[in-house]
A protein has these predicted regions:
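Acidic carboxylate motifs that coordinate Ca2+ or other divalent cations, activating on Asp/Glu
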Residues: 363
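Inter-helical turn/loop segments and adjacent helix faces that build the functional surface
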Residues: 11-13, 17, 328-339, 396-402
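Residue-level detector of short, conserved catalytic/binding motifs and their immediate flanks
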Residues: 4-6, 20, 267, 319, ...
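Active-site neighborhood of glycoside hydrolase catalytic domains
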Residues: 382-402
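Surface-exposed coil/turn segments at beta-strand junctions on protein surfaces, enriched
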Residues: 13-15, 131, 143
């Protein structure tokens, strides 16, 4: 769900009730993703891209807040979309769809003078700025020696994901799965608001159960700290529902494309928490990225009909995918799913036995040139590749017996 929850708790340490106001402010940055840069008056880098962006106040059955869109950004631009900043309907507060249009720090000073005076905002005229600021307040009554809380929802809807392996052609635009579920950011925020209590309760239940388990503290820390990766820009789904991932995230873009097989070998969370997503990765690896000879491209190009273009296999990655196919089958119990993958699984294992291959003499030990997760080629027997290979052999044996 493309929504961030920002919850603020105001604590009153005095013996008398207080009225407080919390303000959320956001620039309408549609069109700006950091890839397009200009210069400010000091010749320092300045993000550019917004054009004829506009803010409007909305009030619906469940929410009130600001809806941000653009009339000038190219609808096919990767940074084109909508944003919403909202709070629960029925809360007291004011808003601005624009700040004062003036030079230097005057807009900020005007905002602060207005807000700090009484906790409310007076409107300012819209001056046609390309990246207008919007502000939204919530007024709270805080009891003596008590507390009060308010929640802001920040939602987004950006449909134009581009492939991680562009060719400069129209099919570089591959889209985002989540934007097929909601029409815009406001719709996503409304849907979330109606289900937020249940979603939060389930999340807390999972975390509490895991945190209070008898697993060693080091295991719990490592597992929980890394779960957040699934909710970052490292991972995404295309409109057909397939799940993909970079190796990680850099400051402005994903790092190392392709759902790299030998990197994603170390992911266990997806399979145990979101089995359908994990199985979609196996489907991509075996049904799309594996050729007739059994070579599995260890990086997948997109769109999906280009899945085999990379054309290079990784010994640990390929053997690991075989083991993961076994794991995902055991977790799901879906024999029909395994049946679809089985011919490609067999080819992927047999690829190790081709002439000049990883284990050309079929003695159960890899001796050939073995590209691997260390980004080098191993030659000759070694325990690192050997473990993956023996695991794949054993997994295939179990699947074959079934």
């Amino acid at each position: 769900i493309p929504v961030a929850v920002l919850r603020y708790v105001i604590i009153n340490k005095t013996g008398r009730p207080l009225r407080a106001s919390v303000c959320g402010t956001l620039p309408n940055f549609i069109g700006a993703d950091g890839s397009k840069l200009g210069q400010d008056w000091k010749s320092d880098p300045l993000t550019s891209g917004p054009k004829k962006n506009k803010n409007e106040f909305r009030a619906t059955a469940g929410l009130r807040g600001l809806f941000m869109s653009s009339d000038g950004v190219d609808p096919k631009d990767e940074a084109f979309g909508t944003i919403a900043l909202a709070v629960a309907a029925g809360t007291r507060g004011t808003s601005r769809t624009a700040w004062l249009a003036a030079g230097w720090g005057t807009p900020l000073l005007d905002f602060w003078d207005d807000f700090s005076a009484d906790g409310m905002l007076d409107p300012r005229p819209e001056m046609g700025e390309d990246m207008p600021f919007g502000s939204l307040t919530v007024e709270l009554d805080v009891p003596a020696n008590g507390s009060a809380e308010t929640t802001f929802l920040l939602a987004w809807h950006f449909p134009n994901r581009r492939t991680w392996s562009p060719k400069g052609t129209p099919d570089d635009l591959i889209g985002n799965y989540y934007t097929t579920k909601w029409s815009d950011a406001w719709a996503a925020a409304e849907d979330f608001a109606g289900r937020s209590a249940g979603l939060e309760a389930r999340t807390v239940e999972f975390i509490r159960a895991f945190a209070t388990s008898t697993l060693p503290a080091e295991v719990k820390e490592a597992a929980l700290f890394n779960l957040s990766t699934l909710r970052t820009q490292t991972c995404f789904r295309t409109p057909d529902g397939r799940f993909f991932g970079f190796e990680g995230s850099s400051n402005q873009a994903g790092c190392c494309f392709g759902s790299c097989t030998h990197v994603w070998n170390y992911d266990q969370a997806t399979a145990f928490l979101f089995g359908q997503l994990s199985r979609s990765m196996r489907e991509t690896e075996f049904l799309e990225a594996t050729d007739a000879q059994g070579l599995m491209s260890f990086r997948v190009r997109l769109p999906i009909d280009r899945a085999r273009e990379y054309g290079k296999a990784a010994a640990d990655g390929q053997m690991g995918c075989i083991m993961k196919a076994y794991r995902d089958w055991k977790l799901s119990g879906d024999d029909a799913w395994l049946g679809r993958l089985w011919p490609a699984v067999k080819r992927a294992l047999a690829f190790a036995w081709i002439k000049g291959g990883w284990d050309a003499d079929r003695d159960g030990v890899m001796e050939g040139c073995q590209h691997n997760t260390m980004d080098v080629e191993y030659y000759g027997p070694n325990p690192q590749m050997g473990a993956w290979y023996l695991g794949a052999l054993r997994a295939v044996e179990e699947m074959a017996r079934h």
